[in-house]
Design a protein with these regions (language model features):
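An alpha-helical appendage that flanks or caps ligand/catalytic pockets
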Residues: 1-39, 80-81, 88-181
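Short, solvent-exposed amphipathic alpha-helical segments in soluble enzyme
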Residues: 66, 85-87
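A local structural motif
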Residues: 41-47
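Short, acidic/turn-prone active-site loops that include or flank metal/cofactor-
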Residues: 73-77
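Glycine-enriched alpha-helix->loop->beta-strand junction motifs that scaffold or abut catalytic
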Residues: 60-69
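Divalent-metal (Mg2+/Mn2+/Ca2+)-assisted nucleotide/phosphate chemistry catalytic cores
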Residues: 39-40, 60
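Hydrophobic faces of well-ordered beta-strands that scaffold small-molecule active sites
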Residues: 48-51, 68-70, 102-106
Length: 181
């Protein structure tokens, strides 16, 4: 839908499972008609990037988006979590789209003094945020970030972090985040 709007070729009409443009008669003001974007985009090809987590949304990302913003991305393990969904979506990808780009963020610390155990000082800054997502973003059994950590092979650690976090022990949950995670 966004790409059609940005093209500005004609007024937008779209009927999908969840979106209808313009609204059908009897909804909204009842004056709905296909409209064309008034503004002229600075560039014709505006990249669409999705931050998706679970199989169906990752599959749709690989099929439709220009780029993917995964969370907790581990280059040596990501295929065991998202590989099948990425392959399935890529197989349906339009040849008119460029290959899917992946941008996995992370923390960066540049300091020559951070060697050996001193590296943990940097990791300690990240641990509370990881604990929040793995332990506190969702109910027990319905936390997508916790699920990802389990799929990476950190079942015990993810359960412990969540147990601590949900029982109000946020600092302990942060300390339970292992260095490898």
């Amino acid at each position: 839908v966004c790409r059609e709007v940005w093209k500005r070729e004609k007024g937008l009409s779209y009927t999908g499972q969840t979106v209808q443009v313009p609204l059908p008669a009897g909804q909204g003001t009842g004056m709905g008609k296909p409209l064309k974007l008034i503004n002229h985009p600075v560039r014709a090809d505006i990249p669409v990037w999705w931050a998706s987590l679970k199989d169906l949304s990752v599959e749709a990302t690989a099929e439709l988006a220009d780029g993917w913003l995964p969370v907790f991305f581990m280059p040596d393990k990501f295929e065991q979590v998202w590989g099948a969904a990425l392959k399935k979506g890529s197989a349906k990808r339009s040849p008119s789209l460029k290959p899917l780009e992946i941008s996995a963020g992370g923390l960066l610390a540049i300091d020559e003094s951070l060697v050996g155990e001193a590296k943990d000082k940097v990791l300690d800054m990240a641990r509370p945020n990881v604990a929040l997502y793995v332990g506190g973003m969702g109910a027990r059994g319905k936390n997508f970030y916790n699920d990802i950590c389990r799929e990476y092979g950190y079942e015990h650690e993810a359960a412990e972090i969540q147990d601590l976090y949900l029982s109000g022990k946020k600092d302990e949950a942060a300390r339970a985040v292992p260095r490898e995670m």
